A protein has these predicted regions:
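Low-complexity, intrinsically disordered short peptide segments enriched in small/polar/basic residues
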Residues: 2, 94-95
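Short linear motifs in intrinsically disordered
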Residues: 17, 97-98
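Short helix N-cap motif at coil->helix boundaries in the Bergerat
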Residues: 100, 117
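Flexible glycine-rich beta->alpha loop in the catalytic core of nucleotide-sugar glycosyltransferases
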Residues: 54, 85, 96-97, 103
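Acidic, glycine-centered active-site loop in nucleotide-sugar glycosyltransferases
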Residues: 103-104, 109-112
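Flexible, glycine/small-residue-enriched loop-and-beta-strand segment within the central core
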Residues: 3-86, 111-112, 119
């Protein structure tokens, strides 16, 4: 059998018992199905994951998927903005704003998040 997949408010979480979701974590409530969290991810206090924005020119929503890969760590109060993939074992520093894909095994931080070093 494969790993347990749970949907928490529509968010897809692989192996929720091996995933940490801290206090005050907020998932986009309009399109939670666009958020996919793999096993062993740590979302610390205050992390926010957004999968849509309203386009001021059209009034419609621009959507994108957020995929957080196995073993990634997101520091306190990180904001993740669609469409983004955060690679396996990536570390995102506290207070960062992630606006683009983060490769596996890298440390990123800042607003916007920038490469710091390899793990």
């Amino acid at each position: 059998t494969g790993p347990l997949v749970c949907k928490w408010g529509g968010v897809q979480i692989i192996s929720p018992k091996r995933t940490f979701i801290g206090e005050g974590v907020i998932f986009d409530t309009n399109y939670p199905q666009d958020i996919f969290i793999e096993e062993g991810v740590r979302l610390t206090s205050g992390v926010k994951i957004v999968t849509h924005f309203m386009n001021p020119n059209t009034g419609s929503y621009d959507r994108g998927k957020v995929h957080i890969c196995k073993g990634a760590y997101l520091g306190m109060n990180t904001l993740v903005v669609k469409p983004v993939t955060i690679g396996e074992r990536a570390i995102i520093g506290a207070g960062s704003v992630v606006t683009k894909d983060i490769p596996a095994n890298e440390v990123w931080a800042g607003n916007p998040a920038k490469f710091i070093r390899k793990r």
